[in-house]
């Protein structure tokens, strides 16, 4: 399901000191049986879209799928294919029997980025983030990160790594960096 977000081209451009490069692109994937069934509102996906746009990302897609390995892996593979940017998932990272987003993500990623997942877990207030099983990794030139299903948890997790995401995405795109 798409909510009509089109890529923005008028903000979020990043300067390398000599030239302007395109704004960073992002997609959001919500894993929720309740949202798919219409019994729950998609607050987490909406919160992530807003946080990404505030950070200067052009949000190209916002999709909702049911929990489960096959549905999430299929959507992630589709969203990452040929995409240069960030794919953020929300939901399915806990201990419930259908919380299988990390397992689905492992089917799609080629290289894991454990430092990002560790930073997101450590940033949660009161340490509840330690219960998240979310992972992060790359698929082609897309960086995929899993965040918890609550709006606050999703945004806090994203914000914990926002400062390094532009650099990571430039590295994935094989663009020059200053390191």
Enumerate the language-model features and the residues they cover.
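Non-catalytic beta/alpha edge segments that cap or flank active sites
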Residues: 1-179
């Amino acid at each position: 399901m798409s909510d009509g977000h089109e890529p923005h081209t008028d903000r979020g451009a990043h300067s390398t000191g000599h030239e302007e490069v395109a704004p960073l692109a992002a997609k959001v994937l919500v894993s929720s049986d309740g949202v798919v069934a219409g019994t729950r509102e998609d607050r987490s996906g909406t919160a992530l879209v807003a946080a990404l746009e505030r950070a200067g990302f052009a949000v190209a897609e916002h999709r909702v799928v049911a929990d489960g390995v096959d549905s999430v892996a299929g959507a992630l593979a589709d969203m990452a294919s040929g995409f240069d940017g960030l794919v953020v998932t929300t939901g399915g990272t806990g201990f419930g029997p259908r919380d299988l987003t990390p397992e689905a993500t492992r089917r799609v990623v080629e290289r894991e980025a454990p430092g990002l997942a560790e930073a997101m877990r450590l940033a949660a207030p009161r340490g509840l983030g330690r219960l998240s099983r979310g992972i992060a990794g790359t698929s082609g030139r897309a960086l995929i990160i899993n965040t918890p299903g609550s709006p606050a948890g999703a945004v806090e997790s994203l914000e914990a790594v926002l400062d390094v995401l532009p650099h990571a995405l430039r590295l994935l795109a094989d663009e020059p960096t200053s390191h």
